[in-house]
């Protein structure tokens, strides 16, 4: 798996990820003649993933396991997760895990051209996932209110440390911070010793699992109402 490369003029550069989990994401059913067939429950659902590191990408990975088409938008140089922790053959094991079952396109959201291509993608999407600091998508004119007129059925999943509003909304929201603030680390470890961080980023992974569940429920409800939703998930 090669690191993402810059793509001139905002053109799409799609690369399928390795390690697809075809059997994991399949539901086995019996056909009319008794033959076994497989169907993925999220087949036909297009997800645009905006976000980096763990919570957003893990949400996209879960939806991809179950058949969704996940298009990951990465900045020039790629998601930092590609080089996070231990790296093998130019790519981290973390990215090999959370980048599978996805397509990837490099777009610079700090440029108008990059935002324009992203906006066109969001108009065709069923779901968008983002885990930027609250207000960032609105600054780029890519927030829910900006996209809704052209795509009223869009399900917009937002993951942040402390929520989209409130006194802490603009504070850095990494799981390592919110786990400590919530007291989770205090209850781990040994008596009379400092708090201990678990060997997995639970703030990110639990938020992502709840985000994937929320997206799935919103898809079910959209079949009844034809309306999209905005979901707010937090680490704390």
What role is predicted for each listed range?
Residues 22-226, 234:
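N-terminal helix-loop segment corresponding to the beta1-alpha1 unit
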Residues 229:
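Flexible, acidic loop-helix segments that line cofactor/substrate-binding pockets
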Residues 6, 11, 15-20, 25-26:
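Low-acidity, Ser/Thr- and Arg-rich intrinsically disordered low-complexity segments
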Residues 5, 232-235:
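Residue-level detector of conserved catalytic or cofactor/ligand-binding positions
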